[in-house]
Amino acid sequence: MKGLGFAGVYTLALYAANFIQIPQRSMQSIATGIISQAWKDKNYAEINRIYQRSSINMLLMSLFIFGCLLLNIENLFSVLKVQENYTAAINLMIVLGLVRVIDAGTGVNGTIIATSTFWKFDFFSGIILLAIRLPLAYIMIRQFDIIGAAYAELISISLYNFIRFEFLRRKFNM
């Protein structure tokens, strides 16, 4: 399979993996106002508490959803009568699911940085992500076909979240 066939398989895997992010998006929306108020009140203990709890809770929720997806993926494919060549999406779903679990496991680190006085770091770390992701995806796709795109996503998002984690640890001792 080449070209648009790969795009269809990747899209199917991406939609399934994005299902893991639903609790994360809700948690970030709720936490934004609370974290903004805590920054205003200089309540660093509250920000740290939210960061720790969100990381643990989102990691557990995303692992649960990821596990449910993995356990039921073949049943889902048979119920939806997915074409045989789309079963290649299973490996993609595993890798992209890990990306979403890692992203969720870092909690609301992006929200904390974006609402702090260091909001510019969030912008620059996004540029770093882009600068890493594009060439890495190009190289990995040439080397490993479509699964290379998922590996590139895994590497770049892991590095991106590690950079933000380290920033919070060094600047705010969180």
Where are these regions (language model features)?
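Membrane-interface junctions at transmembrane-helix termini in multi-pass inner-membrane proteins
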Residues: 97-128, 139, 168-172
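Interfacial segments at transmembrane-helix termini and the short loops linking adjacent helices
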Residues: 5, 60, 69-101, 147
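Interfacial/gating helices of multi-pass transporter permease domains
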Residues: 1-18, 42, 46-50, 86-91, ...
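Membrane-water interface segments that mark the loop-to-transmembrane alpha-helix transition
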Residues: 45-66, 125
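Helix-loop junctions and terminal segments of transmembrane helices
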Residues: 13-55, 109-115
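Membrane-interface helix-loop junctions in multi-pass transport and translocation proteins
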Residues: 5, 120, 127-162, 166
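Transmembrane helix-bundle signature of multi-pass secondary active exporters and lipid flippases
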Residues: 10-29, 61-65, 96-103, 156, ...
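Membrane-interface "helix-start" segments
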Residues: 54-58, 92-95, 124, 156-174
